[in-house]
Protein backbone atom coordinates (compact mmCIF):
# COMPACT_ATOMS: atom_id res chain seq x y z
CA UNK A 1 0.00 0.00 0.00
CA UNK A 2 1.28 3.46 -0.94
CA UNK A 3 2.23 5.75 1.92
CA UNK A 4 -0.26 8.55 2.44
CA UNK A 5 1.28 12.01 2.66
CA UNK A 6 -0.52 15.04 4.08
CA UNK A 7 0.36 18.40 2.51
CA UNK A 8 -0.17 21.66 4.37
CA UNK A 9 -0.03 24.63 2.02
CA UNK A 10 -1.83 27.92 1.33
CA UNK A 11 -5.28 26.49 0.61
CA UNK A 12 -6.89 29.79 1.66
CA UNK A 13 -5.45 31.21 -1.59
CA UNK A 14 -6.78 28.46 -3.86
CA UNK A 15 -9.76 30.58 -4.92
CA UNK A 16 -7.76 33.25 -6.72
CA UNK A 17 -3.98 32.75 -6.60
CA UNK A 18 -2.37 31.02 -9.57
CA UNK A 19 0.94 30.33 -7.88
CA UNK A 20 -0.65 28.77 -4.80
CA UNK A 21 -2.66 26.31 -6.88
CA UNK A 22 0.07 25.45 -9.37
CA UNK A 23 2.79 24.86 -6.76
CA UNK A 24 0.37 22.53 -4.93
CA UNK A 25 -0.24 20.66 -8.18
CA UNK A 26 3.52 20.38 -8.79
CA UNK A 27 4.29 19.16 -5.28
CA UNK A 28 1.46 16.62 -5.44
CA UNK A 29 2.71 15.39 -8.81
CA UNK A 30 6.26 14.91 -7.52
CA UNK A 31 5.07 13.06 -4.41
CA UNK A 32 2.90 10.81 -6.57
CA UNK A 33 5.89 10.07 -8.83
CA UNK A 34 7.71 8.83 -5.71
CA UNK A 35 5.00 6.20 -5.30
CA UNK A 36 3.13 7.96 -2.49
CA UNK A 37 -0.44 9.20 -2.20
CA UNK A 38 -0.56 13.02 -1.71
CA UNK A 39 -3.51 14.59 0.10
CA UNK A 40 -3.86 18.34 0.55
CA UNK A 41 -5.18 19.36 3.96
CA UNK A 42 -7.71 22.18 3.79
CA UNK A 43 -6.42 24.45 6.52
CA UNK A 44 -7.90 27.94 6.66
CA UNK A 45 -6.89 29.82 9.76
CA UNK A 46 -9.66 31.65 11.57
CA UNK A 47 -9.67 35.18 10.22
CA UNK A 48 -8.30 34.15 6.82
CA UNK A 49 -11.21 31.94 5.78
CA UNK A 50 -13.76 33.45 3.41
CA UNK A 51 -17.14 31.84 2.74
CA UNK A 52 -17.64 32.67 -0.95
CA UNK A 53 -21.28 31.57 -0.84
CA UNK A 54 -22.21 34.15 1.79
CA UNK A 55 -23.78 37.48 0.76
CA UNK A 56 -21.22 40.17 -0.08
CA UNK A 57 -22.21 42.40 2.89
CA UNK A 58 -21.77 39.55 5.38
CA UNK A 59 -18.40 38.65 3.90
CA UNK A 60 -17.24 42.24 4.17
CA UNK A 61 -18.43 42.45 7.78
CA UNK A 62 -16.80 39.16 8.81
CA UNK A 63 -13.51 40.32 7.33
CA UNK A 64 -13.41 43.96 8.41
CA UNK A 65 -14.52 43.35 12.00
CA UNK A 66 -12.43 40.25 12.69
CA UNK A 67 -10.22 41.03 15.75
CA UNK A 68 -7.79 38.20 14.92
CA UNK A 69 -6.71 39.63 11.58
CA UNK A 70 -4.05 42.23 10.83
CA UNK A 71 -4.89 45.37 8.85
CA UNK A 72 -2.79 44.06 5.97
CA UNK A 73 -4.65 40.75 6.08
CA UNK A 74 -8.02 42.49 6.02
CA UNK A 75 -7.04 44.61 3.07
CA UNK A 76 -5.68 41.62 1.18
CA UNK A 77 -8.86 39.62 1.69
CA UNK A 78 -11.18 42.46 0.78
CA UNK A 79 -9.23 43.32 -2.35
CA UNK A 80 -8.21 39.87 -3.52
CA UNK A 81 -10.94 37.53 -2.29
CA UNK A 82 -14.19 39.13 -1.19
CA UNK A 83 -14.59 41.42 -4.19
CA UNK A 84 -13.38 38.98 -6.84
CA UNK A 85 -16.15 36.41 -6.82
CA UNK A 86 -16.05 35.87 -10.58
CA UNK A 87 -12.55 34.39 -10.44
CA UNK A 88 -13.35 31.45 -8.17
CA UNK A 89 -15.19 29.10 -10.60
CA UNK A 90 -12.24 28.74 -12.98
CA UNK A 91 -10.02 27.93 -9.99
CA UNK A 92 -12.40 25.42 -8.44
CA UNK A 93 -12.68 23.62 -11.79
CA UNK A 94 -8.90 23.17 -11.83
CA UNK A 95 -8.56 22.07 -8.21
CA UNK A 96 -11.39 19.54 -8.51
CA UNK A 97 -9.79 18.05 -11.61
CA UNK A 98 -6.14 17.94 -10.56
CA UNK A 99 -5.81 18.08 -6.76
CA UNK A 100 -6.65 15.48 -4.15
CA UNK A 101 -7.92 16.80 -0.81
CA UNK A 102 -8.34 15.18 2.58
CA UNK A 103 -12.05 15.09 3.40
CA UNK A 104 -11.86 17.11 6.64
CA UNK A 105 -11.53 20.90 6.71
CA UNK A 106 -9.73 22.67 9.55
CA UNK A 107 -10.37 26.30 10.41
CA UNK A 108 -7.98 26.54 13.36
CA UNK A 109 -4.75 25.02 14.59
CA UNK A 110 -6.66 23.76 17.65
CA UNK A 111 -8.86 21.67 15.36
CA UNK A 112 -5.75 20.17 13.78
CA UNK A 113 -4.35 19.27 17.20
CA UNK A 114 -7.62 17.80 18.46
CA UNK A 115 -8.18 15.67 15.38
CA UNK A 116 -4.96 15.30 13.34
CA UNK A 117 -5.33 13.69 9.91
CA UNK A 118 -4.11 10.05 9.80
CA UNK A 119 -1.15 10.27 7.42
CA UNK A 120 2.18 8.44 7.29
CA UNK A 121 4.11 11.71 6.92
CA UNK A 122 3.40 15.41 6.56
CA UNK A 123 4.87 18.04 4.23
CA UNK A 124 4.58 21.78 4.74
CA UNK A 125 5.22 24.01 1.76
CA UNK A 126 5.80 25.40 -0.64
CA UNK A 127 4.46 28.94 -1.02
CA UNK A 128 4.58 31.60 1.72
CA UNK A 129 3.38 29.39 4.57
CA UNK A 130 6.14 30.71 6.85
CA UNK A 131 5.58 34.39 6.02
CA UNK A 132 4.66 36.09 9.33
CA UNK A 133 3.19 39.13 7.55
CA UNK A 134 0.42 36.97 6.11
CA UNK A 135 -0.35 35.55 9.55
CA UNK A 136 -0.70 38.85 11.41
CA UNK A 137 3.03 39.26 12.14
CA UNK A 138 3.31 35.96 13.97
CA UNK A 139 4.22 32.36 13.20
CA UNK A 140 1.33 30.03 12.46
CA UNK A 141 2.07 26.77 14.36
CA UNK A 142 -0.06 24.76 11.95
CA UNK A 143 2.26 25.46 9.04
CA UNK A 144 5.15 24.34 11.24
CA UNK A 145 3.29 21.02 11.70
CA UNK A 146 3.14 21.34 15.48
CA UNK A 147 -0.05 19.20 15.51
CA UNK A 148 1.71 16.12 14.10
CA UNK A 149 1.95 13.25 16.63
CA UNK A 150 5.39 12.12 17.80
CA UNK A 151 6.98 9.43 15.65
CA UNK A 152 5.54 10.69 12.36
CA UNK A 153 7.91 12.45 9.98
CA UNK A 154 7.56 16.19 9.46
CA UNK A 155 9.04 17.52 6.23
CA UNK A 156 9.46 21.11 5.08
CA UNK A 157 9.78 21.30 1.31
CA UNK A 158 10.77 24.80 0.15
CA UNK A 159 8.41 26.85 2.33
CA UNK A 160 8.85 30.58 1.86
CA UNK A 161 9.18 33.28 4.49
CA UNK A 162 8.67 35.79 1.69
CA UNK A 163 10.49 38.59 3.54
CA UNK A 164 14.05 39.69 4.33
CA UNK A 165 13.43 39.95 8.07
CA UNK A 166 10.87 38.69 10.56
CA UNK A 167 9.45 40.37 13.68
CA UNK A 168 11.32 39.80 16.95
CA UNK A 169 8.36 37.93 18.43
CA UNK A 170 8.63 35.33 15.64
CA UNK A 171 12.27 34.52 16.34
CA UNK A 172 11.93 33.09 19.85
CA UNK A 173 9.80 30.06 18.99
CA UNK A 174 11.30 29.33 15.57
CA UNK A 175 13.99 26.87 16.69
CA UNK A 176 11.50 24.89 18.77
CA UNK A 177 9.35 24.35 15.70
CA UNK A 178 12.25 23.49 13.38
CA UNK A 179 13.93 21.02 15.74
CA UNK A 180 10.99 18.64 15.31
CA UNK A 181 11.41 18.27 11.54
CA UNK A 182 12.95 15.14 10.05
CA UNK A 183 13.86 17.01 6.85
CA UNK A 184 14.19 20.76 6.40
CA UNK A 185 14.58 23.04 3.40
CA UNK A 186 13.50 26.53 2.43
CA UNK A 187 12.76 28.32 -0.84
CA UNK A 188 14.86 31.48 -0.61
CA UNK A 189 18.36 32.25 0.55
CA UNK A 190 16.94 35.15 2.55
CA UNK A 191 14.90 32.63 4.56
CA UNK A 192 17.94 30.42 5.08
CA UNK A 193 19.84 33.48 6.35
CA UNK A 194 17.04 34.30 8.82
CA UNK A 195 17.06 30.73 10.19
CA UNK A 196 20.86 30.73 10.44
CA UNK A 197 20.78 33.98 12.40
CA UNK A 198 17.90 33.00 14.71
CA UNK A 199 18.54 29.29 15.20
CA UNK A 200 22.14 28.64 14.16
CA UNK A 201 20.88 26.07 11.66
CA UNK A 202 22.15 25.61 8.10
CA UNK A 203 19.31 24.44 5.90
CA UNK A 204 19.35 23.93 2.12
CA UNK A 205 17.63 26.24 -0.34
CA UNK A 206 15.42 24.20 -2.66
CA UNK A 207 13.54 25.00 -5.84
CA UNK A 208 9.88 25.90 -5.74
CA UNK A 209 7.88 22.77 -6.71
CA UNK A 210 6.77 24.42 -9.95
CA UNK A 211 10.38 24.26 -11.14
CA UNK A 212 10.58 20.50 -10.58
CA UNK A 213 8.38 20.00 -13.66
CA UNK A 214 9.54 20.85 -17.18
CA UNK A 215 7.61 22.58 -19.96
CA UNK A 216 6.38 19.29 -21.42
CA UNK A 217 4.94 18.26 -18.05
CA UNK A 218 3.21 21.61 -17.63
CA UNK A 219 1.80 21.32 -21.15
CA UNK A 220 -0.35 18.44 -19.86
CA UNK A 221 -2.48 20.94 -17.94
CA UNK A 222 -1.83 24.20 -19.84
CA UNK A 223 -4.70 25.61 -21.91
CA UNK A 224 -4.39 28.49 -24.36
CA UNK A 225 -7.08 31.07 -23.47
CA UNK A 226 -9.68 31.67 -26.14
CA UNK A 227 -9.66 34.79 -28.31
CA UNK A 228 -6.06 35.74 -27.56
CA UNK A 229 -4.42 38.06 -30.07
CA UNK A 230 -1.54 36.55 -32.04
CA UNK A 231 0.98 38.72 -30.19
CA UNK A 232 0.42 40.34 -26.81
CA UNK A 233 1.88 41.44 -23.48
CA UNK A 234 0.71 39.27 -20.60
CA UNK A 235 0.40 41.31 -17.41
CA UNK A 236 0.09 39.90 -13.89
CA UNK A 237 0.37 42.64 -11.29
CA UNK A 238 -0.30 42.73 -7.54
CA UNK A 239 1.38 45.97 -6.49
CA UNK A 240 0.39 49.61 -6.89
CA UNK A 241 3.41 50.79 -8.88
CA UNK A 242 2.40 53.59 -11.24
CA UNK A 243 5.85 53.32 -12.79
CA UNK A 244 5.11 49.71 -13.72
CA UNK A 245 1.77 50.72 -15.26
CA UNK A 246 3.46 53.47 -17.25
CA UNK A 247 6.25 51.20 -18.47
CA UNK A 248 3.84 48.48 -19.62
CA UNK A 249 1.75 51.03 -21.51
CA UNK A 250 4.88 52.47 -23.16
CA UNK A 251 6.00 49.01 -24.30
CA UNK A 252 2.48 48.27 -25.54
CA UNK A 253 2.37 51.49 -27.55
CA UNK A 254 5.90 51.28 -28.94
CA UNK A 255 5.63 47.67 -30.12
CA UNK A 256 1.89 47.77 -30.91
CA UNK A 257 1.19 44.89 -28.54
CA UNK A 258 -2.20 44.63 -26.82
CA UNK A 259 -2.22 43.96 -23.07
CA UNK A 260 -3.83 40.78 -21.74
CA UNK A 261 -4.14 40.91 -17.94
CA UNK A 262 -4.83 38.17 -15.43
CA UNK A 263 -6.76 39.32 -12.35
CA UNK A 264 -4.55 39.95 -9.33
CA UNK A 265 -5.63 43.15 -7.56
CA UNK A 266 -8.65 45.35 -8.38
CA UNK A 267 -6.33 48.36 -8.04
CA UNK A 268 -4.56 47.37 -11.28
CA UNK A 269 -5.44 49.74 -14.11
CA UNK A 270 -5.57 47.08 -16.84
CA UNK A 271 -8.75 45.30 -17.88
CA UNK A 272 -8.55 41.77 -16.47
CA UNK A 273 -9.75 38.59 -18.17
CA UNK A 274 -11.65 36.69 -15.47
CA UNK A 275 -11.86 33.54 -17.61
CA UNK A 276 -8.17 32.90 -16.97
CA UNK A 277 -7.82 30.04 -14.50
CA UNK A 278 -4.61 28.23 -13.51
CA UNK A 279 -4.51 26.21 -16.76
CA UNK A 280 -5.12 29.33 -18.87
CA UNK A 281 -2.51 31.23 -16.84
CA UNK A 282 0.09 28.72 -18.05
CA UNK A 283 -1.15 28.97 -21.63
CA UNK A 284 -1.16 32.76 -21.56
CA UNK A 285 2.47 32.88 -20.39
CA UNK A 286 3.58 30.20 -22.86
CA UNK A 287 2.11 32.04 -25.85
CA UNK A 288 2.91 35.62 -24.82
CA UNK A 289 5.30 37.87 -26.71
CA UNK A 290 6.33 39.40 -23.38
CA UNK A 291 5.37 38.86 -19.75
CA UNK A 292 5.28 41.88 -17.42
CA UNK A 293 4.73 40.98 -13.78
CA UNK A 294 5.62 41.53 -10.13
CA UNK A 295 4.92 37.89 -9.32
CA UNK A 296 7.25 35.07 -8.27
CA UNK A 297 5.37 32.38 -10.16
CA UNK A 298 4.90 34.49 -13.29
CA UNK A 299 8.70 34.75 -13.26
CA UNK A 300 9.08 30.99 -12.82
CA UNK A 301 6.73 30.04 -15.66
CA UNK A 302 8.29 32.63 -17.98
CA UNK A 303 11.62 30.90 -17.38
CA UNK A 304 10.14 27.42 -17.86
CA UNK A 305 8.48 28.41 -21.15
CA UNK A 306 11.41 30.59 -22.26
CA UNK A 307 9.09 33.56 -22.69
CA UNK A 308 10.76 36.99 -22.57
CA UNK A 309 9.82 38.74 -19.33
CA UNK A 310 10.11 42.03 -17.51
CA UNK A 311 9.88 41.67 -13.73
CA UNK A 312 9.10 44.63 -11.47
CA UNK A 313 9.49 44.99 -7.68
CA UNK A 314 6.12 44.72 -5.95
CA UNK A 315 6.99 46.79 -2.88
CA UNK A 316 9.25 49.70 -2.04
CA UNK A 317 12.55 48.52 -0.58
CA UNK A 318 12.02 50.91 2.34
CA UNK A 319 8.34 50.11 2.80
CA UNK A 320 6.76 48.55 5.87
CA UNK A 321 5.95 45.41 3.86
CA UNK A 322 8.57 44.14 1.43
CA UNK A 323 8.21 40.77 -0.26
CA UNK A 324 10.57 41.46 -3.16
CA UNK A 325 13.12 38.93 -1.88
CA UNK A 326 11.24 36.07 -3.54
CA UNK A 327 11.81 37.48 -7.04
CA UNK A 328 15.34 38.63 -6.21
CA UNK A 329 16.31 35.16 -4.96
CA UNK A 330 15.00 33.28 -7.98
CA UNK A 331 16.66 35.70 -10.43
CA UNK A 332 19.98 35.42 -8.57
CA UNK A 333 19.69 31.63 -8.48
CA UNK A 334 19.22 31.58 -12.26
CA UNK A 335 21.97 34.21 -12.82
CA UNK A 336 19.39 36.57 -14.33
CA UNK A 337 19.67 39.48 -11.89
Regions found by a protein language model. Give the residues of each.
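Acidic donor-binding loop of glycosyltransferase active sites
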Residues: 286-292
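Catalytic binding pocket for nucleotide-activated donors in carbohydrate/polymer assembly enzymes
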Residues: 300-337
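Helix-loop-beta element that forms the nucleotide-linked donor phosphate-binding surface
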Residues: 192-210
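A short beta-strand/loop micro-motif in the catalytic core of glycosyltransferases
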Residues: 181-188, 292
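Active-site donor-nucleotide binding/catalytic segment of nucleotide-sugar enzymes
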Residues: 120-171, 205-272, 278
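Aromatic- and Gly/Pro-rich donor/ligand-binding loops
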Residues: 5-18, 22-176
